[in-house]
Amino acid sequence: METYETSIGTQSYPPTLFPPPLGTGGFTTSGYIHALVDSTSNSNSNSNTNSNTNSNTNSNSDTKIPIVQISDDSHITHDSFKPYMEYHDASHLRNRNISKADQVESTEVMEQFTQWSNYKMRSRSPTINAKPIRHTSQRRTDFTSKNELSKFSKNHNFIFHKGFLKRQHSIRREDRQAKVRSRFRSKKELTSVLNYIELEQMDIANVLASQPVNLHAIRNLTSRDPAVTPIPFLRSQMYATSSRPPYLRNRSISRKLPKSQPGSLPTTMPATATKTIKQNSTTPTTRSVYNKNVGRSNTSPSVLYHPKRRGKLNTKSHARKEQLLLELWREYLMLVITQRTQLRLTLLCSPGSASNESSVCSSNASDLDMSLLSTPSSLFQMAGETKSNPIIIPDSQDDSILSSDPF
């Protein structure tokens, strides 16, 4: 233990710990800190301790941890802090050099395989103090009158005024989170362009990017409040429109046509079905409470791109898929057990074995193999056995295959 003299008395601390700061542990706040790094004073202060303490302090003196002495001498100046500050700066510089050396080694390794320096230079952000790029102002107002347009349209001439169809790349638009570069900023600009276009004489090949055109047909309605609802009496291509307002419609998320059995759908729609449809459309149903909260359908992009949210909405379908995976895994394990049992029976009934029943096994080997492959569960139900007490085929004493496991 190391001793420290104060204005109050002598206090001892462990050799590996520094004394408490000023204002704590009975010290006065008017004290000053002396950093004494001399190793001789360290050895002299430890001469009166026991042998166990000497061994600890000698090992501690090798590391040259500075001793902090607190006193109330008013003549001490800030120059006494220099040894301690020099020690602190030296340790800080040493740690920085070590981390810098590790960084250089990792950079050299990256340079062996990639152009890491070039990539790092490109990824650096531009300087903050750089001045923004200035552009000349562009006029975007269309001053063309209708008389002028009608005059030039007779001769199929066009008027391109200053600033026609030009986009100004401003700094504010570049800093937006959603960079949507619209062709026209206002309805007036779109109208001024459409005045020069004749939609009746326009060739559709100039508008479409590719030759084939995809036309999507409605098969499954999955929106929350669909305006078109399927009727089970009609065919899959025919749908009936709903005349009820949105708050009176059924709020089921998934709306699919039921699977029709062959021969169940008639060729023509019966008269009873038309009557029921008319009655349902004329007689209003009981008004349900309208939910003002905005809900998302099952086909919204947020549901499709976030599996966690999709699992919350479709808990039943997730449980059904999980049950299907468990059934497939169980069937796979049963098939593996069956094949290993079949291999063992084939080796036991091989012609090289010395058992007396080799001829019987070889005659019935094909039938047994087919039964095992076709019905795996029948393996544990032969001779009145159950799954808890399966059949175990013991090894013969004269058999060349020595194994204690049944499979």
Curated annotation (Swiss-Prot):
Chief localisation class: other
Biological process according to GO: axial cellular bud site selection; establishment of protein localization; mitotic nuclear division
Region of interest: Disordered: 41-64, 277-315
Biased composition (Low complexity): 41-61
Cellular component, GO annotation: cell division site; cellular bud neck; cellular bud neck septin collar; cellular bud neck split septin rings; cellular bud scar; nucleus
Any GO MF annotation of the entry: SUMO binding
Record-listed Phosphoserine modification sites: S260, S264, S300, S302
Ranges spanned by the short sequence motif SUMO-binding, renumbered to the chain: 391-398
Localization per record: Bud neck; Cytoplasm, Cell cortex
Keywords: Cytoplasm, Phosphoprotein
Compositionally skewed regions (Basic residues) per UniProt: 306-315
Induction behaviour: Expression is regulated by the ACE2 and SWI5 transcription factors.
Stretches with biased composition (Polar residues): 277-302
Other facts: Present with 504 molecules/cell in log phase SD medium.
Function recorded in the entry: May be involved in a mitotic signaling network. Binds sumoylated proteins and may stabilize SUMO chains.
Assembly and interaction partners: Interacts with CBF2, GIS1, NAP1, PRM8, REI1, SHS1 and SMT3.
Name of the protein in question: Protein NIS1
Organism: Saccharomyces cerevisiae (strain ATCC 204508 / S288c) (Baker's yeast)
Organism placement in taxonomy: Eukaryota, Fungi, Dikarya, Ascomycota, Saccharomycotina
Gene that specifies this protein: NIS1
